[in-house]
């Protein structure tokens, strides 16, 4: 539930507290399940 820079907290995304930055919008990262999936699986974790 804690953010790990540069990724935001999944919890904040799910409850609507996350506000996408200009770079997020430029990369077409929008609020929703897809962003949560990207946060969980989009880093070096995989």
Curated annotation (Swiss-Prot):
One of its GO terms (molecular function) is endochitinase activity. It catalyses: Random endo-hydrolysis of N-acetyl-beta-D-glucosaminide (1->4)-beta-linkages in chitin and chitodextrins. The keyword Hydrolase applies. One of its GO terms (biological process) is defense response. Induction: By glucan and P.megasperma elicitors. InterPro entries: Glyco_hydro_19_cat, Lysozyme-like_dom_sf. Keywords: Carbohydrate metabolism, Chitin degradation, Chitin-binding, Glycosidase, Hydrolase, Plant defense, Polysaccharide degradation. Its EC number is 3.2.1.14. The keyword Metal-binding does not apply. It is an enzyme of class 3 (hydrolase). SUPFAM superfamilies: Lysozyme-like. Defense against chitin-containing fungal and bacterial pathogens. Belongs to the glycosyl hydrolase 19 family. Chitinase class I subfamily. This is Endochitinase 2.
């Amino acid at each position: 539930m804690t953010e790990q820079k540069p990724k935001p907290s999944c919890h904040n995304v799910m409850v609507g507290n996350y506000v996408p930055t200009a770079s997020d919008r430029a990369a077409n990262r929008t609020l929703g399940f897809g962003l949560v999936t990207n946060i969980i699986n989009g880093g070096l974790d995989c």
